[in-house]
From Swiss-Prot:
Oxidative deamination of D-amino acids. Its cofactor is FAD. One of its GO terms (cellular component) is cytoplasm. It comes from Pseudomonas syringae pv. syringae (strain B728a). Gene3D superfamilies: D-Amino Acid Oxidase, subunit A, domain 2 (3.30.9.10), FAD/NAD(P)-binding domain (3.50.50.60). The gene is dadA. GO terms for molecular function: D-amino-acid dehydrogenase activity. This is D-amino acid dehydrogenase. Belongs to the DadA oxidoreductase family. It catalyses: a D-alpha-amino acid + A + H2O = a 2-oxocarboxylate + AH2 + NH4(+). FAD binds at residues 3-17. The keyword Cytoplasm does not apply. Keywords: FAD, Flavoprotein, Oxidoreductase. Pathway: Amino-acid degradation; D-alanine degradation; NH(3) and pyruvate from D-alanine: step 1/1. The keyword Flavoprotein applies.
């Protein structure tokens, strides 16, 4: 059975790999010249299941208003003429309740924990190397209020069976020795010892090579135009003016997924959250991070690779704008300079931005659609690397009609009201001109 995967980021590539392992004949198509060239290229590098949390949380609307007035705020909103931007924000606000937060976080942690286990198995089976570390994640709180507010997350961690450790200042210095000189500005920390780190782009590139060895064909530099459909089936995909056909289709195009789904009548509220990163060469390994730390105040992660520090975070709701905002670089430099002033050379840092495909409830969209042969794997937000292996494995099981190892409840597109009836009311696409 032939499967056409659209997108070669970490989500599309893991989907292709697990589909090939399940015995499918897989082709991956992408407009870029290689795998992991967009959102997966320079993300924060953390595999953090326990910190899988939706942006839509109680108190966020009030915080967002305050952030709009702050120079180094973790969230910025740039008004556009795109109506989808405002619809997405309205949906996000509706998810900022305690009950919705608990439901959404449980779904995210469920998939993320499974994904971490799949990554462990993959590493054991293949020996894939990507500058990975398994030394946990430490969330730093600069105020007592932040430490107190961690209680709701701890409740979900306990419910999900995720190990954790609350740290005082001495505990912070024990797990991250380079922070010993700055613990005076911290009130405490929450550490998840089972979290991991690694270079997502390096992982994706090497997994793509392994997928090729399994028979997967990667076709780069090709423009995906639209899906051709009739009734409840996809007939093919128009790619560079030619209709390409398969038995099953997987859409893993991140923030660009809705552009192909809207003509089908599928409501996929995936919108880009623009993020930034700095990649800093390490000058003093003893004064660099040991693993990953999260700065709760600025919503920024600082991650240790072999010889580099990756500083990533921020969220701009600004449409598909990929320009580099120098103020965001200033913020990232300020944070890493505050916590690890002797760790790396900021004058040699690489500055990058990418669009993180985010749903208003934070949970990705993984699974079937109203079209019988179309499947989605998109909307992972800031957690694409964390959720990639689990999402790919889950999707491959669903396509192969195997029972997945975890519940897929609440993960597919139907939670947004997409039904078979919607698909039946969509007229077939016109013939390609």
């Amino acid at each position: 059975m032939r499967v056409l995967v659209l997108g070669s980021g970490v989500i599309g590539t893991t989907s292709a790999y697990y589909l090939a392992r399940a015995g499918f004949q897989v082709t991956v198509v992408d407009r870029q010249p290689a795998a992991a060239m967009e959102t997966s290229f320079a993300n924060a590098g953390q595999v953090s299941p326990g910190y899988a949390s939706p942006w839509a949380a109680p108190g966020v609307p009030l915080k967002a208003l305050k952030w709009l007035l702050q120079r180094h705020a973790p969230l910025a909103i740039k008004a556009t003429a795109d109506i989808d931007q405002y619809l997405w924000m309205a949906q996000m606000l509706r998810n900022c309740t305690a009950s919705r937060y608990a439901i959404n976080k449980e779904r995210m942690v469920r998939l993320s924990e499974y994904s971490r286990d799949c990554l462990d198995e993959l590493r054991l089976e293949t020996g894939i190397a990507y500058e990975g570390r398994s030394l946990g994640t430490t969330q730093l709180f600069r105020t007592q209020a932040q430490l107190d507010n961690a209680a709701k997350d701890i409740a979900v961690l306990e419910q999900s069976g995720v190990p954790y450790e609350l740290l005082d200042r001495d505990g912070i210095a024990r797990v991250e020795p380079a922070l010993a000189g700055v613990t005076g500005i911290l009130s405490g920390a929450l550490r998840l010892p089972n979290d991991q780190t690694g270079d997502c782009q390096l992982f994706t590139t090497r997994l793509a090579e392994m997928a090729v060895a399994l028979g997967v064909e990667f076709r780069y530099g090709q423009n995906i135009e639209r899906l051709d459909h009739a009734g409840d089936r996809i007939n093919g995909v128009w790619i560079d003016g030619k209709l390409e056909t398969a038995d099953r289709y997987v859409l893993a195009l991140g923030s660009y997924s809705p552009q192909l789904l809207k003509p089908l009548g599928i409501k996929a509220p995936v919108y880009p959250l623009k993020g930034y990163s700095l990649t800093v060469p390490i000058t003093n390994p003893d004064m660099a991070p040991t693993s990953t730390i999260l700065d709760e105040t600025y919503k920024v992660a600082i991650t240790r690779f072999d010889n580099r520090i990756r500083v990533g975070g921020m969220a701009e709701i600004a449409g598909f704008d990929l320009s580099l905002n120098p103020r965001r670089r200033e913020t990232l430099e300020m944070i890493v300079g505050d916590l690890y002033p002797q760790g790396g050379d900021l004058t040699q840092a690489d500055f990058w931005t990418g669009l993180r495909p985010t749903t208003p409830d934070g949970t990705p969209i993984v699974g079937a659609t109203p079209f019988r042969n179309l499947f989605l794997n998109t909307g992972h937000g800031t957690l694409g690397w964390t959720m990639a292996c689990g999402s790919g494995r889950l999707l491959a099981d669903l396509i192969a009609r195997k029972t997945p190892r975890i519940s897929a409840e609440g993960l597919d597109i139907s939670r947004y009201g997409n039904t078979q009836e919607n698909a039946q009311h969509v007229h077939p696409a016109p013939a390609h001109q």
